[in-house]
Regions:
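Rossmann-fold dinucleotide-binding core
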Residues: 4, 76, 91, 97-190, ...
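Conserved dinucleotide-binding and phosphotransfer motif residues
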Residues: 23, 111, 255
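Rossmann-like NAD(P)-binding element
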Residues: 33, 44-102, 127-135
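Hydrophobic beta-strand scaffold residues
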Residues: 27, 46, 115-116, 259
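Glycine- and other small-residue-rich loops at beta-strand/loop junctions that grip anionic moieties
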Residues: 9, 65-66, 93-94, 161-162, ...
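NAD(P)+-binding Rossmann beta1-loop-alpha1 motif at the extreme N-terminus of oxidoreductases
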Residues: 1-61, 87, 124-127, 288
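Helical "substrate-binding/catalytic lid" subdomain
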Residues: 144, 165-293
Length: 299
């Protein structure tokens, strides 16, 4: 029986684990914070110590990390580097910055441990029933565990991208594209909202989600949200970002590549958090000064 250890049993990690179990893989799971209600209903073998996960797996070990990028991933790589044996394989399925991935790959190489980067898309549903996987790392290493990626991916949803970091690089660009597409959908509905027509947004989204050129997962989730609350009255229009959009833009600046749509979509997210509206106040005051245009006073 093939075995995989999975570290990080949040929404994505837990659903990937269930996907593995459906594919007859024996899965050992570890997380610092375990949701017992979720875990008790599955065939997942849950361990409370990282060392126990490592010792439970047959060698060469395959460990899939599904944890937040940055410091959490960094610390985990350090710990695993000390615990694992030569020829073991770590898969980073999170949204790590590709430059960090290359550095970690080189660090683990000193211990003859392989790091494979796997850009993972498709959300929670994809993790559970078939994900989109962009994989980077040494070709021979990736070939040796291609059975795992093929098991977890939707049909035609897995590709070996290239050398270390390339999987995370392609996922970063994917997320940048996602920002731009989401912003365009948001702006379209904003225009509908300001029109003189009394529109049923759920009907609009349903039609757009079925057979139109702009159909797809993002329109499907828009329809799902509007079906619950057509005017989104319960939601504040504040949008967070998880870093990949910024990394995409930084890469474009470095390579001198023009990506105005992705850049504008990230800046729109920043603006959504701006309660001061200071730039708007500056522009309004300039118009007032040079042209006597009206300014609106605070009530």
């Amino acid at each position: 029986v093939r075995q995989v250890g999975i570290i990080g049993l949040g929404k994505m990690g837990y659903n990937l684990a269930l996907n593995m179990i459906d594919n007859d893989i024996l899965v050992f799971g570890y997380d610092k914070f375990i949701n017992k209600d979720l875990i008790e209903n599955s065939k997942l073998v849950v361990l409370t110590k990282l060392q126990d996960l490592v010792t439970s797996l047959a060698r060469p070990r395959v460990i899939w990390m599904m944890v937040p990028s940055g410091e959490t991933t960094e610390n985990l790589i350090d710990e695993l580097g000390r615990m694992l044996s030569p020829n073991d394989i770590i898969i980073d399925g999170g949204n790590s910055r590709y430059t960090d991935t290359i550095r970690r790959y080189k660090y683990l190489k000193e211990f003859d441990i392989s790091l494979v980067d796997c850009g993972t898309s498709g959300g929670v549903n994809g993790a559970r029933y078939g994900a989109s996987l962009m994989v980077g790392g040494d070709l021979e290493v990736v070939k040796s565990i291609s059975w795992l990626f093929e098991s977890l991916a939707i049909k035609d949803g897995y590709a070996y991208i290239g050398e270390s970091g390339s999987g995370h690089f392609v996922k970063m660009v994917h997320n940048g594209i996602e920002y731009g597409m989401m912003q365009a959908i948001g702006e379209g509905f904003d225009l509908l909202e300001h029109s003189h027509y009394e529109l049923n947004y759920k009907d609009v989204a349903r039609v757009w989600a079925n057979g139109s050129i702009i159909q797809g997962l993002l329109m499907d989730v828009t329809l799902s949200a509007l079906s619950k609350d057509e005017k989104l009255t319960s939601i504040a229009g504040r949008i967070d970002d998880s870093g990949e959009g910024q990394w995409t833009i930084e890469e474009a600046l470095k390579l001198k590549v023009s990506i105005p749509v992705i850049a504008a979509s990230l800046f729109a997210r920043y603006k959504s958090r701006d309660d001061l509206l200071f730039s708007e106040k500056i522009v309004a005051s300039m118009r007032n000064e040079f042209g006597g245009h009206k300014v609106y006073k605070k009530k």
